[in-house]
A protein has these predicted regions:
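Generic secondary-structure boundary/loop-capping signal
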Residues: 25, 30-32, 44, 96, ...
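Hydrophobic pocket/interface hotspot
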Residues: 10, 24-29, 33, 53, ...
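Short, flexible active-site loop motifs that bind/organize anionic cofactors or intermediates
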Residues: 12-15, 43, 116
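Short, low-complexity N-terminal intrinsically disordered segments enriched in polar/charged residues
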Residues: 1-31, 131-135
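A beta-strand edge to alpha-helix "cap/lid" segment located at domain peripheries
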Residues: 2-5, 58-135
């Protein structure tokens, strides 16, 4: 697939996420995606499948936010099968504290699916979030 097609896949998934369907993004991840969350937070590490990433990071974060984190696209940069998606995640922590994190996700596509990704983010903010009890 072309860089433009990969960009469209991400844009469409984010549009769905913004309407209340965050699972749309996770559906573009290959079942055996290799996804790394940088840092030393409770959700940092390398996940070797879509389900492991959802279980090990996404759900843990989701249990500590009020509602969902809404993505605001900053920009999407593409070259060949590589794509960098910079975005702001906006929401509220379970205790009512505003949550505003800037993310940069570097991804590699193959046949329309993300096969590798690295998530860069404000890890200090994630530490604060992870200190909250599950909601």
């Amino acid at each position: 697939m072309s860089a433009a097609q990969n960009k469209k896949i991400v844009e469409d998934a984010i549009a769905e996420w913004r309407t209340g369907n965050p699972e749309a993004f996770y559906e573009i991840l290959d079942e055996n995606v290799n996804w790394t969350v940088i840092g030393s937070t409770a959700v940092s590490g390398t996940y070797t499948s879509r389900q492991a990433f959802i279980d090990g990071a996404v759900q843990k974060i989701g249990k500590r936010v009020d509602g969902m984190v809404v993505p605001e696209i900053v920009d999407i940069l593409t070259e060949g099968d590589k794509l960098v998606f910079r975005w702001d995640g906006i929401g509220k922590m379970a205790d009512g504290t505003p949550y505003h994190n800037r993310y940069s996700w570097a991804m590699t596509f193959k046949d329309g699916k993300v096969v590798e990704g690295t998530a860069y983010l404000d890890t200090a903010l994630v530490d604060t979030l992870m200190d909250l009890p599950d909601s």
